[in-house]
């Protein structure tokens, strides 16, 4: 009613939608379907209204061709592809090859043609024992938790996965006080247990730290389009990260 009373469906894009969040909106009578697009290629996929699949970004739109590279990267060909980056042939050549746009996203395509984004190629974590982990998919599982604002998975060339969390302080705005709260710690510990129960052992979060501030543009941890700069976060919070890889492996 607050949205006018005639809203029947909403679309989501730009970042993975957690399954729990999608289920919540469906339960309250507002299906939230996912699609996928990018500046260089326009809208690429959308879930069909009559048969959406949770966790999928849908099927390619008319005129759009998709395929996967050998490493799983999603490639797109369509009339909507851009001609190239302005006065930057080197950058253009890196993403446009033989009429295909290399998206940088790792994807799976099922037998019915539904596409699932599993991570970003450049954000791939490879553990010290060679296991490949796509952090974006796991991070998206925390979206339903109201106390969590941001989450960053760590584990590249390391023996196990850890995480940094920032907090959603709501109206109080006091994340420093929240970060010291035993109740908040238990909430996040329970959230980690919930997510871990959905993951194979090599992807499970073994330790975590709760930060008393957000990742910010001013500190170089976020881009102007609000994407996390993982390397800068690791540099700025290297003490917290080092602590998680010292001593025993159980969660803290």
Predicted regions and their residues:
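Conserved adenylate-forming
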Residues: 1-71, 79, 158-160, 167-178
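Ser/Thr-glycine-rich phosphate-binding loops at phosphate-binding pockets of nucleotides
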Residues: 37-41, 103, 127-128, 223-225
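Conserved ATP-binding/catalytic segment of the ANL
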Residues: 60-127, 144
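A generic "binding-loop/recognition-motif" signal
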Residues: 81, 121, 138, 157-159
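C-terminal boundary motif of the adenylate-forming
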Residues: 106, 111, 144-170
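Adenylate-forming
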Residues: 115-143, 171-182, 201-205, 219, ...
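Conserved C-terminal "lid"/linker of ANL adenylate-forming enzymes
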Residues: 150-153, 193-252
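Conserved loop-to-beta-strand segment in the C-terminal subdomain of adenylate-forming
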Residues: 156-175, 198-212
